[in-house]
Amino acid sequence: MAYAVVRVRGSVGVRGDIADTMKMLRLHRVNHCVVIPENDHYTGMIKKVKDYVTYGEIDKETLVSLILKRGRLAGNKRLSEELLKELVELPVDALAEKVLAGEIKLKDTPIKPVFRLHPPRRGYDRGGIKKGFSIGGALGYRAGKINDLLNKMM
């Protein structure tokens, strides 16, 4: 299982410890996304920044499309299935399965670990970016609904 974490809010007025945690997660700008494994270390970091990000469990299809559409190599070069198979020696589906299982981290591959996304088409659907998802906003844990949001942002 892996989490997709998307930064929703900016950096103005953020406490120092939360800003440091965002840097550790590589979430430097709004609409940046990282895919991280589910473990105690990352779970604690996500809980600390939950008022500035949204997160949930990413599925295989969304991860494959995220890698192919928004994945980049050093020098901002786009990825293709052939290039990825040559560099990682795995097809995209197998790479996505291993990332979801926690066997491989994206930072261990030539793919940049941060996906730069567009703002969501038609917005966040609900009460804005200052409220939690459970009460109608965009922040915090959203379980499988993160896949819908990522598809709107690709």
From Swiss-Prot:
The keyword Ribosomal protein applies. GO terms for cellular component: cytosolic large ribosomal subunit. InterPro entries: Ribo_uL30_ferredoxin-like_sf, Ribosomal_uL30, Ribosomal_uL30_arc, Ribosomal_uL30_CS, Ribosomal_uL30_euk_arc, Ribosomal_uL30_ferredoxin-like. One of its GO terms (biological process) is translation. Transmembrane segments: none annotated. It holds the Pfam family Ribosomal_L30. Disulfide bonds: none annotated. SUPFAM superfamilies: Ribosomal protein L30p/L7e. Keywords: Ribonucleoprotein, Ribosomal protein. One of its GO terms (molecular function) is RNA binding. Part of the 50S ribosomal subunit. Belongs to the universal ribosomal protein uL30 family. This is Large ribosomal subunit protein uL30. It comes from Methanococcus vannielii (strain ATCC 35089 / DSM 1224 / JCM 13029 / OCM 148 / SB). The gene is rpl30.
